[in-house]
């Protein structure tokens, strides 16, 4: 988990959509009058607001990760591996193949891990075609915010 992020984490589009009228008014003004200052200030405010929201989301994810580590240690100590729990936070869902490849375990063990994590309420399984996805319930809720 100590890798660099290779995708953007500041999504300005939600702020711009929420303030669409102001955005287009200021953008139009830059095109018609050449006045850039107000538009630049708008974008800087968008960056600030989005950064604050992103920091809060990252903090929530970190707290959820820590709480999940504790929950697994307490409720499923036989399957606890920090790498397993961290894998659950790399994306909102896990598949048996992810666990097999990332943790270098047998398919049977990976399946057992995911089913046990579902049993203790961390994951929720969802069948899609032939494959079963295990959704990290709390992470999905955080990402919806």
Which residues fall in each region the model found?
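Short acidic, hydrophobic short linear motifs in intrinsically disordered regions
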Residues: 80-85, 90-103
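Short, cationic-aromatic polyanion-contact patches
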Residues: 77-78, 125-145
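Active-site lining segments that contact anionic ligands and/or coordinate catalytic metals
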Residues: 93, 120, 131
């Amino acid at each position: 988990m100590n890798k660099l992020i290779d995708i953007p984490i500041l999504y300005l589009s939600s702020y711009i959509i929420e303030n669409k009228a102001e955005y287009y008014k200021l953008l139009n003004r830059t095109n018609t009058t050449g006045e850039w200052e107000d538009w630049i200030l708008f974008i800087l405010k968008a960056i600030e607001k989005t950064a604050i929201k992103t920091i809060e989301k990252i903090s929530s994810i970190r707290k959820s990760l820590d709480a999940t580590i504790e929950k697994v240690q307490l409720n499923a100590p036989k399957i606890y591996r920090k790498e397993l729990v961290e894998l659950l936070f790399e994306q909102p869902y896990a598949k048996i193949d992810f666990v097999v490849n990332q943790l270098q375990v047998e398919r049977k063990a990976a399946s057992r891990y995911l089913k046990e994590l579902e049993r203790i309420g961390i994951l929720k399984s969802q069948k899609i075609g032939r494959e079963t996805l295990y959704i990290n319930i709390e992470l999905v809720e955080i990402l919806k915010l």
